[in-house]
Regions:
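Bacterial N-terminal signal peptides that target proteins for export
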Residues: 1-11
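Charged, low-complexity intrinsically disordered terminal segments
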Residues: 20-423
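Bacterial N-terminal signal peptides
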Residues: 9-19
Length: 423
């Protein structure tokens, strides 16, 4: 005989499950992420910037109109021609009385082949640019491997913000000899969530510099934005009314927020998932979520590159996507260059653009930031770009897999996947 309390508990669980099934994936992800502390606002515009040229043209145009402050937070500024153009523009704005603050990661700087050196930093400071290094790498190095600042945030006058996957480097426009063209994604946000991105920047700026930057002047008010009329417009009907939430991963504070979002987004899917990520080393939870989505009848498409900028990690990626392919995931292998984009689209209803990779560094260690965009029109724009890139990709099958990877390479992939928790 089942006790009445047990029956009530079972009925309640059933009702909750039925309610979840009837709830759209977009409203479900908003509800679940709000429970984890993510705030959403409804008054945003979002413009996708789909190439390096488009990103830098738009961002430079916005900086050129700045009146009060320009804040930049990047993993690295590669010391090349695009950085020279940026620093010249920032110095010009500083001479006009605009507060210019720039932050870069010490490991990110040292790990690129054209780092900013002390003499460069001195010269920039002499030109009025406040620039600081987050956690400089020093002997014995080990303590500085983890908890890097991998975010890419720019906020101008507290009214316009940029975020996504691109740092500052020529190769986002010109590509490289090793990987060819460099494909990536950025976006410009206007609206309430600019305040969230500004708060993220100011918090880490004050931590690094031990300053006390604060005040209403750094946050979006009711001022006219007419002086930013030179930027690429948001052509969606939903412009100015898009729901956006910012996921901010801080070590020891919000450790699980990025993996939680991706897991919940995949689990909430009912019809389709389109995913691009350059370092798809994944963890067990995400692999299971993707498998279960396929079992539910969700069309799951994943795109990764045949080229990469680092060793070993791509071998792990290829091993993973081959396993996923055998489990029913449609895998596209992008060929023209390196797809460094970090996006997911779910059910055509919501998407994310940001800095987070799906590897151990982003999910377990680094400072990261992604924008959740709950808007069908923006998601459709991103989805159309995904479909366009399929024309430059081949679909992974048993036959194409054997042509793509030699037995030796397959073994390296198997070995690399054992190292996934550290890649």
């Amino acid at each position: 005989m089942i006790e009445p309390s047990r029956i009530r508990s079972l009925l309640l669980s059933l009702l909750i499950s039925l309610a979840a099934l009837s709830q759209g994936s977009d409203s479900l992800i908003v509800q679940q992420m709000r429970e984890e502390g993510v705030k959403f606002s409804h008054n945003n515009s979002v413009v996708l910037l789909t190439t390096g040229q488009e990103k830098f043209d738009d961002m430079f145009a916005a900086i050129d109109r700045a009146r009060s402050s320009v804040h930049l937070e990047y993993f690295n500024f590669r010391n090349d021609s695009i950085a020279d153009c940026l620093f010249d523009l920032l110095a010009k704005k500083a001479s006009e009385g605009v507060k210019v603050r720039a932050l870069f990661d010490g490991f990110g700087n040292d790990s690129n082949n054209r780092p900013l050196k002390k003499k460069h930093l001195r010269a920039l400071r002499e030109r009025g640019i406040e620039i600081y290094e987050f956690d400089p790498v020093q002997f014995p190095w080990v303590n500085h491997v983890f908890h890097r600042d991998h975010r890419k945030i720019v906020v101008i006058d507290g009214n316009v913000a940029y975020t996504g996957g691109m740092n500052v480097a020529d190769y986002y426009i010109k590509g490289t000899e090793v990987v060819g063209s460099w494909r990536d994604m950025h976006c410009r946000i206007e609206g309430q969530e600019v305040n969230t991105l500004q708060a993220i920047f100011i918090k880490i700026w004050n931590k690094v510099t031990r300053q006390n930057v604060h005040g209403a002047e750094y946050y979006r008010g009711n001022d006219s934005l007419d002086y930013f009329d030179n930027l690429k417009p948001d052509t969606c009907k939903s412009a100015g009314n898009k729901m956006v939430g910012i996921i901010n991963r801080e070590p020891r504070t919000s450790n699980k927020i990025i993996r939680s979002f991706y897991t919940k987004a995949i689990n909430a899917s009912k019809d389709s998932i389109k995913l691009i990520n350059p370092y798809l080393t994944l963890n067990r939870t995400l692999k299971k979520a993707l498998r279960n989505a396929v079992k539910r009848g969700v069309k799951v498409e994943v795109m990764v590159s045949t080229h990469s900028d680092i060793p070993l990690t791509p071998d792990c990626v290829f091993y993973n996507v081959h396993k996923l392919m055998k489990q029913g995931v449609i895998v596209w292998m992008y060929q023209p260059g390196f797809h460094h984009t970090k996006v997911i689209m779910v059910d055509g209803k919501f998407c994310t653009v940001g800095s987070a990779n799906l590897n151990a560094r982003s999910l377990r260690f680094d400072y990261e930031e992604n924008a959740i965009i709950v808007d069908k029109e923006t998601t459709l724009q991103l989805s159309n770009l995904f479909d366009k890139d399929k024309a430059d990709s081949f679909r992974l099958t048993s036959e194409t897999w054997n042509k793509f990877r030699t037995p030796c390479q397959k073994f390296v992939g198997w070995f690399a996947h054992l190292l996934a928790p550290w890649l």
